[in-house]
Amino acid sequence: MSTFVSTTFGKISGRHGSAVAAKYRNGMNVLKVFTAPFNPKSVKQVAVRTKFKFVIDTLLCMNKLFMITFHGLGEFHHAVSLALKYAVTGTSPNFSLDYTKMIMSQGTVYGAEQLTVAKTTGTSVKVDWVSSLLPATALATDNVNLIFFNEAKKVVVLLQNCALRPADTIEVELPAEWAGANLHTWIYFSLADGSHNSLSEYISQVQL
C-alpha cells in the first residue's frame, strides 16, 4: 500500500478523507483527490453487458465456422460485432437473434438471385439459385458454400465447395439425427482459390 508523509497529518496510508495515497511507476508517493468510481451497474450498462453475453453464448457453437468464413477479418469477434449491429432484437434481458439478418460471410465476390431450399427425401435438401442474372464478371469457377444451422441442437454444418456457380442447383444430405428439425440456411460464394468470399445470403428455414 502507498504511504504519503504529510507535514500536517504525518504519515498517511491508503485513503484519508477526500484524499488517497498513490504510488506512481517511478516510485514517487503522492496524495491525490479520491474520486468515487462510476457506477458499473447502471441499468444501461447491465443491459449492454447482458446483450454482449447473450450474443457470445449464442454464437459460440459457430466458432469454428467463423474461423473459416471470417478468416483474416477477426473471425469470431467479427461475427459477434456484426450480430450486435444487425441481428439482435428485443430488450434486456429478453434478447433474441433474427437469423435472417445474420451475416455469415463477407466479401466482394458476387452472390446469386432467386434462392430457394426445399426438403426432398429423408434428411436431404435441394438448394437452387440463379446465376444468369449476374454481370458477366461473376466467375463460372466460383464455388458454392452452404450453411445449415440446427438452432435446437446448437449445431452448424458448413458444406464448402459443394458445387460451382453455373450448376444453379444442388442436393445435399444432412445428418440423419436432424430428421424433423427446423434449419436456418445460408449460401455464399468464394473464388476458386478460396481467397475471397461473397456476402452471405439467408435463404429460408427448412424442416427436414
Model-inferred region functions:
Residues G74-L208:
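Charged linear interaction tracts used for macromolecular binding and regulation
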